[in-house]
Amino acid sequence: MSRGKRPKWMIEIAIERMNILFERAEMEFERHPERSNRYVVLAKKLSTKYNTKIPDKWARRYCKRCNKFLYPGHNATVRLVNEEVNILCGECGHVMKIPYHKEKKNKRRARYESIKKRNDE
């Protein structure tokens, strides 16, 4: 038997709390990296408890394997390789590969539409 769906206000509070935890993790990383890693673990627990996604802004800022907060230039390396963004975790060596075909496609479409609009005028 299912437990039922959580109210929308609970989910909104959980998302707001996850944003706060990730912002604190970013602020605390310089002085206390272990504390920022703890904030990431707490945010992940919130997302599993309330069955919500971690906000897109923060989804690329932690390692999916070791759950450490990634700060480019300190414990993460970001590279652009073959139409994808490679984020290398400096803690465990895990590589996250994120394609960016959609961005290129939208850019091409916008360029095509602007040329089409110019020709119509």
From Swiss-Prot:
The GO molecular function terms of this record are: ribonuclease P activity; zinc ion binding
Q: What is its main location?
A: cytoplasm
Cofactor names: Zn(2+)
Q: Which domain of life is it from?
A: Archaea
What note does UniProt attach to the cofactor annotation? Binds 1 zinc ion per subunit.
Question: Which InterPro entries does its entry note?
Answer: RNP4, Rpr2/Snm1/Rpp21
Reactions the enzyme catalyzes = Endonucleolytic cleavage of RNA, removing 5'-extranucleotides from tRNA precursor
Would you kindly state one Gene Ontology biological process term found in this protein's UniProt entry? Answer: tRNA 5'-leader removal
**Chain positions recorded as Zn(2+) binding sites:** 63, 66, 89, 92
GO terms for cellular component: cytoplasm; ribonuclease P complex
Task: List the Pfam families hit by this protein, alphabetically.
Answer: Rpr2
Arranged from A to Z, the UniProt key words for this protein are: Cytoplasm, Endonuclease, Hydrolase, Metal-binding, Nuclease, tRNA processing, Zinc
HAMAP family found in the cross-reference section? RNase_P_4
* Assembly mode: Consists of a catalytic RNA component and at least 4-5 protein subunits.
The UniProt similarity line reads: Belongs to the eukaryotic/archaeal RNase P protein component 4 family.
The protein, known as: Ribonuclease P protein component 4
Biological classification of the source: Archaea, Methanobacteriati, Methanobacteriota, Methanomada group, Methanobacteria
